[in-house]
Amino acid sequence: MKKVIDWFKWLGKTEFVELKDIDCSEDPVRPELDLKFRTSYDRKIFGLKHDDKIEGIMCIAFTKDVPHTVRELDLMSRISHYEKDSDSIIAYTVWSRKRGAGKKIMEEALKFAKTKGFKRIVTLSPLTPMATHYHIRNGAKLLGHNPTTQNFEYKV
């Protein structure tokens, strides 16, 4: 049991930080989205930092509605950027480099959302068993299936 506890001990020494640059080709979900897309119209990239290394990455957008495609995400985040009316964070890609980082970065994103006054975090997830299990295990509720994506909701 002690080995398991020691294995995840590093998670207590992490920091949720905004990133200005990442290697987009590392993204296992949406590698086709370039850095400009990920950082324009109030879209942001966050990392889970431990000992000067980024162990988890999450790309988010701010919207008022729930997108079902990347195109809708783009349009909705542009509208919210200009209208300044977003109330939801859309996590459209999450990945980790170290065991436990995926869960921890979602926990940190929920804290961030709460401190910034957002109502919820909604995902724009691929239709894969891995994505489904990740979100259900972390406490999200399935909002719906779309032709190419699925949405899960985390209450803040």
Predicted regions and their residues:
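Conserved GNAT-family N-acetyltransferase fold
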Residues: G56-M58, V94
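Conserved catalytic-core motifs of GNAT/GCN5-like acyltransferases
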Residues: I136, K141-Y154
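A short, internal acetyl-CoA/4′-phosphopantetheine-binding micro-motif in the GNAT/acyltransferase core
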Residues: I89-A101
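Short amphipathic alpha-helix that is part of the acyltransferase structural core
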Residues: M1-S40, I45-H50, I54
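Conserved acetyl-CoA-binding loop-helix of GNAT-fold acetyltransferases
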Residues: K98-K114
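Conserved beta-strand-loop-alpha-helix junction that forms the acyl-donor binding cleft
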Residues: S96, V122-H133, T148
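Conserved acyl-donor/pantetheine-binding loop and adjacent beta-alpha core of acyl/acetyltransferases
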Residues: C59-I90
